[in-house]
């Protein structure tokens, strides 16, 4: 059972009773908590958890409880903006803004060809938005340049699943976490990124002692502190760790030989790649003591059930897809997949990033179709009533490739939808410079760092002001009902896309409007027809069922289907050539394989085991930049704080960026708690206060990525490298080289000055000065001596939030 009891979390501001509660789903992380939106006098005034929803039983995380404040923010955009000749954004009508975009799109296609418009969307929209965008982009604009910020967070999910199983869709679900004996989290700080899921894990663990919890993370996160076993590895050594652990399992013959023989291919090649990976070698590269590695290997080799989860700590690391494929390999060689309590659960970060992949809003065609398979292209052409030869095909291009094309003058229009890319992209100064070379459209509810580089800004509706479906991390389709009208002058993403299609006069091959639906529900009904017979079949889903049954996990092939708690329970995988979503890629170079290369392997419905080669991160600490840098989330904020920064509660909990540094590293440099320091990498620098402790290992710095104004130099992505994984093309945010320096002022002691006097002048304490100068007494310094003055001592609170609040 998932929960011992329900607990209705509620955050509401209302004078008297609310007018109504509207069915909804949280729009923050990928857990997909059911909730109700409070409405009074036509405004959203609160939220409460849905006690009947199986995912959360009424619980909400701190971000989810406070998301509605953004709807009422006084700085909402309520009119389009167009940049004038003087370089200033000024108000414009919707007609003027949309006509300008349509005119620019037509001009770009005429001058540069069809593959010259880049559409870069989000993981926070609705399935209906993504499907509409996919149809407009591919069948209307004939562009293959469709990507989203999901490339930054969870692209590796898709590609590791394609490599191993032939199709997207994570095999396990949250239900399996409730049954498993062993839960292993790879780079997944669930206590801060998915607080309700963490509560669900801890609820069971406190009641039953299960699951045995293994956490793989270079930091001592809140999650790691609850682990039975914390594998605190060197940054970028995930594959080195997995190779050793899996090699040990194979060596000890703790594998399911019948499952391997009947349901997989490639075991010999995989085993050969691990032949020279004793645990001693893993110890060398990971820094984890061999005794700890032996304990982990024994647990993985003997557990009767196993769920693994992965998130950005793995996805944003060197050789991310190889690491996730190795995790799939582990499940396959032990036969722990498609069974209750077992399977890989490759997580998502955003509330609907999975839906963007499913609906075709990013690299692949809708409903997990293979753009390298002519039969699949013909299917979608028939469904859309367009000529197959007009649909763009070929390898998908990630956002970093889009930026390179912009730099070369190959992209004439960049449409940025629902994401603050000028803060979230790696090496952001490069991205900012590139935007000056193209026409930029930004679709967002607020002015952001990205609207600062826009030529046109479109004010978009927020959650609660529109209707549609989302897909969470475990394939559950959830419904969001519209609770209120958006502010006057604001349109939903869906409405904007329909408007654009009309102004572009997009037609099917019979001359009828390409977009034949007018509402989100009509759009969903069309997508159901597109999904029929595919791995993500949603034929049996309706809006009514989603509300009545509190979500359904695909596939749901007919109206009597209750949904599918886990995939591959029949051990039949999507690797038949006519079924596969992809023919795969070369595991090391990322080159797309041909249909013949795939067919020659003869997978025929069997899962594919791959060799896993360890390659160290492309950038490593050196003499000039001697420290590792990694980035990540805080429990209080979401992405770049566009929404959470407008909640007074969340903003006050974490108002500014900082850097975590190990106590010993700080002591060597006489850095004191809260003082301003400068972090520099080969790409840029930031100045943030120091948070000192043992949350990071020696030689590693951690900077949260939420903060990024152009005025304050505190954006983590001023520092991060833009190397990408060769298969998923996901940037490697988690490993960059950097250095840290004190930002201080020298003060020469004058006659009559005391340390107390100097401390008061700079707003410091005597203890601050003593610590910064390695003094034991205020009398250890004399007239003429020079004191180092640490600037801007800032109170950086040590994490006060307990994820499960002691009450689960």
What are these regions (language model features)?
Residues 118-126, 284-288, 311-318, 350, ...:
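Conserved short loop/turn motifs at secondary-structure junctions
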Residues 225-233, 459-461, 465, 476-487, ...:
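Short beta-alpha connecting loops at secondary-structure transitions
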Residues 744-767, 782-797:
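Primarily a LysM-type cell-wall glycan-binding module
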Residues 1-252, 262, 289, 293, ...:
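N-terminal export/assembly segments and adjacent metallocofactor-ligating motifs
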Residues 174, 465-486, 496-497, 501, ...:
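Glycine/threonine-rich phosphate-binding loop and adjacent beta-strand/alpha-helix elements that clamp
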Residues 487-489, 493-558, 624, 640, ...:
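Long, contiguous, secondary-structure-rich segments that constitute the structural scaffold
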Residues 85-90, 252-290, 368-391, 484-592, ...:
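N-terminal leader/propeptide and maturation segments of large enzyme subunits in energy/redox metabolism
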Residues 131-202, 209-214, 239-243, 284, ...:
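Extended redox/cofactor-interaction regions of prokaryotic respiratory oxidoreductases
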């Amino acid at each position: 059972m998932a929960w011992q009891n329900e607990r209705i979390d509620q955050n509401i501001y209302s004078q008297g009773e609310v007018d109504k509660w509207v069915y909804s789903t949280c729009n923050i992380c990928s857990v997909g908590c059911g909730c109700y939106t409070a409405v009074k006098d036509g405004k959203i005034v609160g939220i409460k958890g849905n006690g009947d929803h199986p995912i959360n039983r009424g619980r909400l995380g701190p971000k989810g409880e406070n998301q509605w404040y953004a709807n009422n923010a006084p700085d909402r955009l309520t009119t389009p903006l167009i940049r004038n000749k003087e370089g200033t954004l000024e108000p414009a009508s919707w007609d003027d803004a949309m006509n300008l975009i349509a005119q620019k799109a037509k001009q770009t296609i005429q001058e540069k060809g069809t593959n010259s418009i880049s559409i870069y969307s989000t993981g926070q929209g609705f399935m209906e938005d993504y499907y509409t965008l996919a149809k407009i982009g591919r069948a209307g604009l004939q562009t293959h340049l469709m990507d989203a910020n999901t490339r930054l967070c969870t692209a590796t999910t898709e590609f590791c699943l394609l490599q191993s199983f032939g199709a997207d869709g994570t095999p396990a679900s949250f239900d399996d976490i409730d049954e498993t004996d062993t839960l292993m989290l790879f780079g997944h700080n669930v206590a801060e990124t998915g607080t309700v899921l963490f509560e669900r894990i801890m609820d069971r663990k406190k009641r039953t002692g299960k699951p045995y919890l293994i956490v793989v993370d270079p930091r001592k996160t809140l999650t790691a502190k609850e682990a039975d076993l914390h594998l605190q590895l060197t940054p970028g050594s995930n594959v080195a760790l997995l190779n050793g652990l899996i090699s040990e399992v194979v060596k000890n013959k703790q594998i399911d030989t019948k499952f391997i023989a009947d349901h997989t291919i490639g075991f010999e090649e995989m085993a050969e790649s691990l032949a020279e990976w004793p645990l001693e070698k893993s110890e060398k590269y990971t820094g984890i003591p061999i005794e700890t590695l032996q304990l982990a290997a024994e647990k993985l080799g003997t557990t009767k059930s196993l769920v693994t989860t992965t998130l950005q700590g793995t996805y944003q690391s060197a050789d991310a897809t190889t690491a996730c494929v190795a995790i799939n390999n582990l499940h396959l060689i032990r036969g722990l997949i498609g069974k209750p309590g077992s399977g890989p659960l490759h997580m998502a970060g955003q509330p609907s990033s999975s839906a963007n992949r499913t609906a075709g809003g990013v690299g692949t065609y809708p409903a997990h179709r293979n753009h390298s398979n002519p039969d699949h292209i013909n299917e979608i052409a028939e469904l859309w009533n367009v000529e197959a030869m007009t649909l763009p095909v070929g390898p998908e291009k990630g956002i970093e490739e889009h930026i390179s094309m912009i730099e070369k003058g190959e992209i004439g229009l960049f449409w940025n939808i629902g994401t603050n890319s000028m803060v979230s992209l790696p090496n952001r100064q490069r991205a900012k410079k590139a935007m000056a070379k193209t026409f930029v459209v930004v679709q967002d509810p607020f002015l952001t760092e990205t609207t600062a580089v826009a030529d046109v800004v479109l004010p978009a509706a927020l959650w609660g002001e529109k209707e549609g479906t989302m897909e969470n991390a475990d394939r559950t389709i959830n419904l969001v009902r519209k609770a209120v009208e958006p502010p006057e002058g604001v349109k939903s993403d869906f409405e904007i896309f329909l408007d654009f299609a009309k102004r572009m006069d997009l037609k099917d091959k019979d001359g009828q409007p390409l977009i034949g639906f007018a509402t989100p529900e009509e759009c969903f009904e069309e997508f159901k027809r597109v999904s029929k017979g595919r791995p993500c079949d949603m034929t049996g889903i309706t809006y009514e069922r989603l509300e009545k049954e509190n979500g359904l996990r695909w596939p749901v092939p007919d109206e009597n289907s209750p949904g599918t708690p886990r995939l591959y329970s029949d051990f039949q995988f999507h690797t038949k050539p006519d079924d596969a979503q992809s023919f795969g890629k070369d595991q090391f170079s990322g080159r797309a394989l041909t249909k013949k290369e795939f067919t020659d392997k003869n997978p025929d419905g069997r899962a594919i085991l791959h060799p896993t080669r360890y390659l160290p991160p492309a950038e490593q600490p050196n003499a000039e930049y001697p420290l590792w840098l990694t980035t990540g989330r805080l429990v209080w904020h979401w992405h770049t704080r566009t929404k959470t920064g407008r909640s007074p509660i969340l903003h006050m909990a974490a108002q500014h960026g900082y850097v975590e540094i190990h106590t010993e590293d700080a002591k060597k440099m006489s850095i004191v708690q809260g003082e301003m320091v400068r972090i520099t990498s080969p790409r840029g620098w930031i100045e943030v206060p120091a948070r000192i402790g043992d949350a990071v290992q020696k030689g590693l710095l951690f900077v949260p990525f939420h903060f990024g104004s152009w005025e304050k130099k505190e954006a983590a992505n001023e520092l991060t490298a833009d190397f990408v994984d060769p298969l998923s093309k996901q940037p490697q945010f988690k490993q960059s080289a950097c250095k840290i320096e004190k930002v201080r002022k020298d003060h020469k002691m004058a006659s009559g000055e005391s340390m107390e006097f100097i401390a008061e002048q700079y707003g410091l304490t005597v203890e601050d000065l003593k610590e910064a100068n390695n003094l034991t007494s205020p009398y250890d310094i004399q007239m003429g001596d020079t004191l180092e003055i640490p600037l801007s001592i800032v109170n950086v609170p040590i994490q006060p939030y307990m994820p499960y609040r002691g009450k689960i």
